[in-house]
Amino acid sequence: MASKKSMNESFLASMKSTEVCSWFELNVMRRTGFYLAWFANKLDIHPNTITILSMILGAGSTWFFMSGSWYYGYGEQGDKMLGVAFNIIAIGMLFWADVLDNTDGQLARLSGKRSRVGRILDGAAGFVWMIPIYLGLAWRIYQHHSMEFGWFGIDDTPRNALIYGLAVLALTFYSGFVGCGGQQRVGDYYMQVHLLFSKEANGTELDSSEQQQQAYDQLPADAKWWERLFMKNYINYTRTQERTTPKLQKLLAKLKEKYGSVSNMPESLRQQLHDYSLPIIHLDFTGFSYRALSLAFFVLIDFPLGQFLFESIVLGLGTLYTIKRHEAFCEKVTREL
């Protein structure tokens, strides 16, 4: 049996960085993920298997999110307690999906089983959860809307319900693809960039669309169709990250031009970039934490429409602020080089 000290050392070794985590994320989410990763490593389970389990669990919570309601209840009898229970089950499933999403990376670092497909799957996991969950919530809102109609004095007619349902569906697509998708894409990229500036970074990866395109072009003729599909989507994913951050791209290009590689920059410059970046990372408008907490809150109070509004407006404005602040310090440092 490993000692407590050696287990703690292994836990820290399984993390890319500890400074970017909140207390709850580090001591609950990540530590739980580490013990699962340690156990999975003993059983020789591949990190990609954990990622796929995370996808199944997260997407599987959709039915419970769609069916849970304390105000309307569940089924013909309108069982309110069952409606509450479904919401709690859905939140629990999403929590464990997120734990497993952390576990796969920790397992990859513990076992050394890293792959390009694993990185792509890990990036896709959140989308695989949220697309069905958001569509399920849109259906729930369409089915149960009398409370909102009552607030605004709208007659609950089939025509009004259809118009409302279509409007909610449009908001769902915006919130999901522009809000959730766009925000997480920016957050993932800024996290990887920050780790480049961090001395404690462990296994940092910063993929470029150019590198990914080259890897795609070098795929063998008999490569699996799903691998081609994932890689093509990942090329578009990284290309969008780069288009969203033009001043960061200029900074990275300048660092490569001056020092040959970002990793060769002087320690004083690395520390400066790190100190600029860390407060922005801690804002966490683009991360999963605010989104998960708001989702739990709005489904429990039976107002899932609030999730789409919160994500589109509050987190959307927070993300724009994050990008503006990050781009400003990149421009400043580039001028000084």
Report each predicted region and the residues it spans:
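C-terminal membrane-associated helical module and adjoining short loops/tails
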Residues: 1-32, 179, 189-337
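A short amphipathic helical element positioned immediately N-terminal to and/or at the very start
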Residues: 29-43
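Structural signal for membrane-spanning alpha-helices in multi-pass inner-membrane proteins
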Residues: 58, 62-66, 133, 137-140, ...
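Membrane-interfacial helical/loop segments at transmembrane boundaries in membrane proteins
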Residues: 76-77, 145-160
